[in-house]
Amino acid sequence: MAVFCASSARLALPTLLRNIYRSEFASELHSSRPVSLRQVSYSHNRFNNGRSFASLSRLLASQSGSHMNPQPSSQPIITESSSEQLDAAEDGSIVGAPTKDAAVNRDRRDPDKPTRKTKKAKFASSQTEPDATSAKSSRDKKHVRSDRASPDYKPKKKKEPWQIQKDALKKKFKEGWNPSKKLSPDALEGIRHLHAVAPDKFTTPVLAEQFQVSPEAIRRILKSKWRPSETEMEDRRKRWEKRHDRIWSHLSELGLRPKTKRTEALDDSNILYGKGEEGNKPSE
């Protein structure tokens, strides 16, 4: 007949599970401080595995020892140690939790207040901006110096007074202040003479239409008081005679003017066939 053993019945699996859960609930009820559900669930999930393994390891050790020396007081010791371990763990979690809650509450209180890191970053960026501008200006100065040191660099010369006046005339008269048609010295004297004899009849627009020049050119001719000397007049006369002969020979080649002995030496055919000034025929 089988004999019932009280110590072995106490170490059975249902009894062990019942004692473990009873010790856990007793330790949770033992804590006197009010803890939020969030903190309890966090601490329970954090320390649940550690407590269960520690209690089971100790129970297995006590079970092996009970077979050798059965002591009825071993089970209460295990439950007390597990309850003390749970209390210490929960106290530690409760003590450490307010620091995290305080930080969260601080952030909720001042959501718009910048942190120290953002302040330091802004201060560093404000210091780097003037440094970048100064570095850029120094680079530009070095670039200008290198351009000046290059052999192709030419410094800008100061304009002469006549250059400044010429630029001003170009801006004022975009088509050009010089007349497109050159007038001979005889034509210039004729314009001055006609305007002096009958200024009401030979006005500036009438003279400009008659000589086919701009009114500004007629106005400058009448306003000018410069008169050439005798030698200058002779040189100008010779130049205009040559110019006249050159134009006449060109028109005669085109068939617009008759050929003359005076303009025959200026024909382009003399250059083509190698005729000299004496009019020698080319050698065959």
Curated annotation (Swiss-Prot):
Feature: transit peptide: 1-53
Q: What is its main location?
A: mitochondrion
The UniProt keywords, alphabetically, are:
Mitochondrion, Transit peptide
The stretch of residues making up the signal peptide is none
Q: Where in the cell is it found?
A: Mitochondrion
Q: What does this protein do?
A: Required for respiratory activity and maintenance and expression of the mitochondrial genome.
Family affiliation: Belongs to the RRG9 family.
- Give the protein name, as stated in the record: Required for respiratory growth protein 9, mitochondrial
Instruction: Give the source species.
Output: Aspergillus oryzae (strain ATCC 42149 / RIB 40)
Source lineage: Eukaryota, Fungi, Dikarya, Ascomycota, Pezizomycotina
